[in-house]
């Protein structure tokens, strides 16, 4: 019996563990487990002459509207790239196309090959939410929304990683429920086989800030929160990994950068996850951060913000603390203090976080659900 061949559309080779912070590789790994043939479909790009045409359009739009223009998703690129992708998949003779994040390329793609699309958000949700999707003119916004709607209607299945994104696609784009699927991501590093046991030594509670964007992840808010608790007499320690803020306190440890692709650095990250009591990343804007899946795998209660798709990974009061976007350092300190006064609740949240990882936030679960989607497509 001939193997089903899945074309995986990606900017980098499928074996590259750096692609989308390792998420593309993890998905590729899971698809292979179910016995499918997986071939890389490299992303299609504008030619030099087409790029000149696009640059002219972009400059014209910026001049006319005196606003930014969405260089990622726009009508000209979509028309050109959809046609190029059609030619690419025709040459490769695939049975199913899996095209994560490819809004631009899928909008006008005409093919009899079933298409599975995946993203961690609707682009419409990111407009004026993420910096690189902000400041667009009205026509650019309308183009973006129109193309995204067209893509979602054109594909056979659209997968999202959070209820936040799924609900938006259904309500705002009116995409049929049966076409939209929720598949949560997993951890992109190895997690312990069992829930690690953590001891509190000399009453010290260790908080981990693991992120590369100090501003967007609001590292200052985490620092100010713990400073309040420190001034109240609590023995707290903050470990910052991935950033280098100008902070000089003996209770703050700063590790500027660790590379997950370097075995020694990866081991250090895992050690920090093993020895911390909380992950504290009060992010300003996020979809579904992989680090929250990883922290759950290590049984860390997570303290963050109820924004974007974050609640897909954290249940407020059960696996961690989720506060509104306008919450202050005092608000966070108040909620954390409740836990420090009742250590048994920290253990309970740790166990709940690990349970959530085992039931939802792991790649085996993702692979099983993805396989069901493929089987359903093939049966039609």
Model-derived features: positions:
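Conserved acidic donor-binding segment of nucleotide-sugar-dependent glycosyltransferases
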Residues: 316-317, 321-329, 338-343
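Acceptor-binding helix/loop patch of EC 2.4 sugar-transfer enzymes
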Residues: 64-68, 111-149
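Carbohydrate-associated surface elements
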Residues: 164, 186
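Short hydrophobic beta-strand element within catalytic cores of glycosyltransferases
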Residues: 301-305, 314, 322
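Aromatic "clamp/platform" in nucleotide-sugar-dependent glycosyltransferases that forms part
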Residues: 284
């Amino acid at each position: 019996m001939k193997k089903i061949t899945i074309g995986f559309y990606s900017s980098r080779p499928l074996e590259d563990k750096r692609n989308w912070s390792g998420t593309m590789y993890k998905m590729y790994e899971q698809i292979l487990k179910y016995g499918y043939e997986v071939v890389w479909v490299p992303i299609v790009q504008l030619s030099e002459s087409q790029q000149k045409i696009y640059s002219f359009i972009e400059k014209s739009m910026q001049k006319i509207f005196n606003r930014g223009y969405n260089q990622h998703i726009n009508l000209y690129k979509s028309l050109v790239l959809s046609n190029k992708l059609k030619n690419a998949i025709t040459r490769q003779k695939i049975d199913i196309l899996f095209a994560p994040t490819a809004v631009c390329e899928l909008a006008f793609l005409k093919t009899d090959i079933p298409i599975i699309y995946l993203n961690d958000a609707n682009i419409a949700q990111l407009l004026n939410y993420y910096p690189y999707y902000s400041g667009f003119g009205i026509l650019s916004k309308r183009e973006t929304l129109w193309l995204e709607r067209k893509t979602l209607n054109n594909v056979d299945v659209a997968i999202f990683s959070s209820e936040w994104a799924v609900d938006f696609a259904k309500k705002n784009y009116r995409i049929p429920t049966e076409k939209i699927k929720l598949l949560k991501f997993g951890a992109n590093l190895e997690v312990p086989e069992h829930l690690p046991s953590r001891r509190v030594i000399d009453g010290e509670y260790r908080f981990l800030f693991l992120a590369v964007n100090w501003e967007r992840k609001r590292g200052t808010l985490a620092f100010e929160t713990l400073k309040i608790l420190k001034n109240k007499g609590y023995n707290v320690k903050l470990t910052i990994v991935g950033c280098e803020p100008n902070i000089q306190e003996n209770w703050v440890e700063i590790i500027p950068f660790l590379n997950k692709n370097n075995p020694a650095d990866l081991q250090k990250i895992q050690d920090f996850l093993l020895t911390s009591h909380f992950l504290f990343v009060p992010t300003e804007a996020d979809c579904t951060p992989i680090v929250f899946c990883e922290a759950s795998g290590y049984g860390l209660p997570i303290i963050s913000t109820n924004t974007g798709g974050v609640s897909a990974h954290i249940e407020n009061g059960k696996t961690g603390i989720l506060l509104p976007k306008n919450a202050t350092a005092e608000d966070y300190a108040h909620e954390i203090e409740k836990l420090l006064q009742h250590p048994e609740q920290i253990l309970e949240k740790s166990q709940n976080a690990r349970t959530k990882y085992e039931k939802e936030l792991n790649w085996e679960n993702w692979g099983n659900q993805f396989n069901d989607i493929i089987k359903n497509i093939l049966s039609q």
